[in-house]
A protein has these predicted regions:
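Short gly/pro/ser/thr-enriched loop/turn and capping motifs at secondary-structure boundaries
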Residues: 37-39, 110-114, 221-224
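Short glycine/serine/threonine-rich phosphate/pyrophosphate-binding segments
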Residues: 14-17, 88-89, 200, 275-276
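Conserved small/polar residues in nucleotide/adenosyl-binding loops
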Residues: 309-311
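A structural-propensity feature for long, helix-poor, extended segments
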Residues: 45-51
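Cap/lid and interdomain-hinge subdomains that line or gate substrate/regulatory clefts
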Residues: 2-5, 29-32, 44, 55-77, ...
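Short polar catalytic/cofactor-binding loops
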Residues: 11-13, 52-53, 271-272
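N-terminal basic/disordered segments at the start of proteins
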Residues: 3-41
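Conserved, well-structured core segments that form the ligand-binding/active-site neighborhood
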Residues: 122-305
Length: 311
């Protein structure tokens, strides 16, 4: 039986990113836009967008706890956070910890150039506190995750990335010992140094079956947790159609304007510069049609239900 998950995210793009990772691993995933929305069908992976990225810390914490209270029964929990530590994630973790146990924190996302070394987050080699974004939004504020958690009242330690090096069995034992020791010493949160994607993968594989813990991390950790679930690879492979020797797959690029084959609908709702670049790149293909739709038009559409997305 698949482990049911609750993912609590503070914005929609992060919520969708995590949900898609589990969907690609073969698990049915639903995204709820708000804590009070009913999921309808009971999905294996339930992701709640609390829309709290810009809320005050106490408001964000209240939304996270409300999501847990309403949807968390019987589910392993991931608190999705931004890989550059935006939002009220510290208050959210502090609100969730008493109910869930040890927080395993891995904010790094090496594929995007965000790594954790000696308890410090680096963005493309630059310490987070020195980046233009941090200077603009958080100048003078603490950027070390462990220190932030301690300031919120949680007892926290940092574990080195070397703990995640080695063969999987040895890493699993080492991580389990570290968590047990930290817990017996009264620790409530562990921040993991992560410098490479394989560190995230090792952490996910070593902890996916543990109880009395919850994960705090970016989309990178969520993706590795999805892949670490038993038979996830087999489920994902089984869900991808294969072509016979004389049959082109549905997504074949051999289609023409006269015989286009399947049409792909891409919906982009992010304001990030990277998303804009991706849209511009797609628009250079003569087969692509780009339509810009104002959010107000979607909200006013007759019969529109914007509270639930099933993936």
């Amino acid at each position: 039986m698949n482990t049911p998950f609750l993912i609590i995210a503070d914005d929609l793009s992060g919520a969708a990113d995590c949900a898609v990772g589990f969907a690609l691993a073969g698990l049915d995933s639903t995204v709820l836009l708000g804590c009070d929305v009913s999921p309808g069908l009971q999905a294996t992976v339930l992701t709640v967008d609390t829309d709290s990225r810009r809320d005050a810390a106490e408001v964000a914490a209240g939304k996270a706890r409300a999501a847990l209270d309403r949807h968390g029964a019987g589910r392993a929990v991931i608190k999705k956070i931004d890989s550059t530590l935006r939002g009220g994630w510290v208050a959210e973790v502090a609100a969730l910890q008493p109910a869930l146990g040890m927080a395993l924190v891995a904010a790094a996302f090496p594929e995007l150039g965000r790594v954790m070394r000696d308890g410090l987050l680096y963005v493309h080699g630059q310490r987070l506190a020195d980046t233009a974004t941090w200077q603009l939004e958080h100048a003078g504020r603490e950027d070390r995750p462990a220190v932030q958690l301690r300031q919120a009242g949680l007892r926290c330690e940092v574990l080195p990335s070397t703990l995640l090096d080695g063969d999987a069995a040895a890493v699993q034992q080492a991580v389990a010992r570290a968590i047990t020791l930290a817990w017996t010493q009264g620790c409530q949160a562990l921040v993991f140094d992560v410098e490479q994607t394989h560190h995230l993968r090792q952490l996910a594989r070593a902890t996916h079956a543990l109880t009395g813990i919850f994960w705090v991390g970016s989309g990178g950790l969520s993706r590795e947790l999805a892949a670490a679930l038993p038979a996830a690879g087999a489920r994902a492979a089984a869900s991808v159609p294969t072509a016979g020797p004389d049959i082109a797959p549905a997504w074949s690029s051999t289609g023409t304007a006269e015989s286009p084959g399947h049409t792909v609908l891409t919906v982009a709702g992010s304001l990030s510069p990277m998303t804009r670049q991706q849209i511009a790149c797609m628009a250079t293909d003569t087969r692509t049609r780009v339509h810009t739709i104002a959010a107000a038009e979607l909200r006013q559409a007759p019969g529109a239900d914007l509270s639930l997305i099933h993936i």
